[in-house]
Amino acid sequence: MLVPKRVKHRREFRGKMRGEAKGGKEVSFGEYGLQATTSHWITNRQIEAARIAMTRYMKRGGKVWIKIFPHKSYTAKAIGVRMGSGKGAPEGWVAPVKRGKVMFEIAGVSEEVAREALRLASHKLPVKCKFVKREAE
C-alpha cells in the first residue's frame, strides 16, 4: 500500500479543493488514461483496489502508471468519544484529487482491454471518471 516514508507533520488541516487540477491533466507516460471529472479524496486502499482490478483484468500484460500519491493524513476520533480534548489520531492517508487530473495510465494493451480495465478501476474510486487517450503530436 502507498504511504509516505516520513512526514514533517502527522496531523494536517483538511484544506479545500477548489477548481481544476493545475498539472497532470494530459496522458504523459502511457497510451490511455483515467481522468477524474469530480474532486475528492482518494485513500491508499482505493488506489490499491483500482490497481489490482486493472492488473487482474489485463492478466499481467501491459504497464500501469499510478500518477497520484496519498501524501495527506486524515484523522479520526474513536467511536463514543465526546467533542473536544484535541484532534484525533491519524487514521490513514489520502490523495486529494481535483477534477481534470489523470490518475492512472496504461500502455502495451489494445484500446478495448484498456477501456475495460480502466472502467473496472473507476468503480473502485469515489470520483466520476472518463477514459482519455494520448494526444497525437
Curated annotation (Swiss-Prot):
Pfam families with a match to the protein in the record: Ribosomal_L16 (PF00252)
**Would you say which domain of life the source belongs to?**
Bacteria
Q: Which PROSITE patterns match?
A: RIBOSOMAL_L16_1, RIBOSOMAL_L16_2
Annotated keywords:
Ribonucleoprotein, Ribosomal protein, RNA-binding, rRNA-binding, tRNA-binding
GO annotation terms (biological process): translation
* InterPro entries according to UniProt: Ribosomal_uL16, Ribosomal_uL16_bact-type, Ribosomal_uL16_CS, Ribosomal_uL16_dom, Ribosomal_uL16_sf
Q: Which GO terms describe its molecular function?
A: rRNA binding; structural constituent of ribosome; tRNA binding
SUPFAM superfamilies per UniProt: Ribosomal protein L16p/L10e (SSF54686)
Would you tell me the Gene Ontology cellular component terms? cytosolic large ribosomal subunit
| The protein's assembly and partners | Part of the 50S ribosomal subunit.
Q: Which family does it belong to?
A: Belongs to the universal ribosomal protein uL16 family.
Q: What does this protein do?
A: Binds 23S rRNA and is also seen to make contacts with the A and possibly P site tRNAs.
Q: What is this protein called?
A: Large ribosomal subunit protein uL16
Q: Which organism is it from?
A: Streptococcus agalactiae serotype V (strain ATCC BAA-611 / 2603 V/R)
The lineage is: Bacteria, Bacillati, Bacillota, Bacilli, Lactobacillales
